[in-house]
Amino acid sequence: MAVQERQFSSSSDAAQALADAIAQALTAALDARGRASLVVSGGRSPIGFFHCLRDAALDWSRVWITLADERWVPDTDPDSNAGLVKQHLLQGAATAAHFLPLWNGAATPAAAITERSLALAALPRPFDAVVLGMGEDGHTASLFPGAAGLADALNPAGPALLAAVDPPAAPHPRLSLTLAALLGSRHIHLPLAGAAKRAVFARALANCDPLRLPVAAVLCQSAVPVTAYLSP
C-alpha cells in the first residue's frame, strides 16, 4: 500500500497532527479492546509531539508505552530514550500509563534480549500505533546501514522481536525492535522535518533498498499502513 504523505507548514503543526492521530488510535483501541499500546522513538525530534500527546484526554491507566529502540545507558543518562520519554511524555495525567523500557541494566544489549522480549510479548499486540523517526543516513529505530546483523533484523518474517546493534558511526550500543516487531502494528507513523530528511525519504521510496536505507523496509512494505508527516 502507498505511504500517505501529509504536508505541514511547520514542525509544530505536524507534531499536533501526529498527536491527534495517535490519541484517536489509542481511543479507538480502548473502546474496542479495553487496552492500548504505543511504540515511540527517542532523540530530540519527538519532544513537541510528546508535549501535545501528554495533554490528550485518554484513560492513560489502560495505555502501554514502549520504545522502538534504546541506547544502552541508564535512564539518568542524557542520551537515554527512556529518560526522554519520562521527562517529556509521562507527565501530568500521562504518568498513569504503563511504560516498558528496553534498558534493563544488563551488561550489554544482547544480554537483555531474552528478558526484554518476554516483557514485550506481554504488551497488547498488534501495537495500536508505532511512531518512528529517521536519520539522514536512512536509519530508523536503531536499524543502521552497515550494522552487523542488519539483514536479519530487517527480515519481515523473522522470529525475533529485538536485535542488539552496534551502530557503525553513532554512539552507544543499542537495543532495537526488529522490522518484524515494528510491522506487528496497526499503523506506523513517521514524522520528518527538514529538506535533508525529505530527500532521504524520497530516495528510500524510489529505490526500496533497505540495506542502504533501512527506513525503506518500512516504507516499501504492504502489510501495515504508513503515514508520513512532512514539515520544513
Give each language-model segment a name.
Residues 34-41, 128-130:
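Short glycine-rich phosphate-binding loop at a beta-alpha junction
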Residues 52-60, 83-86, 145-154, 206:
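A glycine- and small-aliphatic-rich helix-loop capping segment at beta-alpha/alpha-beta transitions
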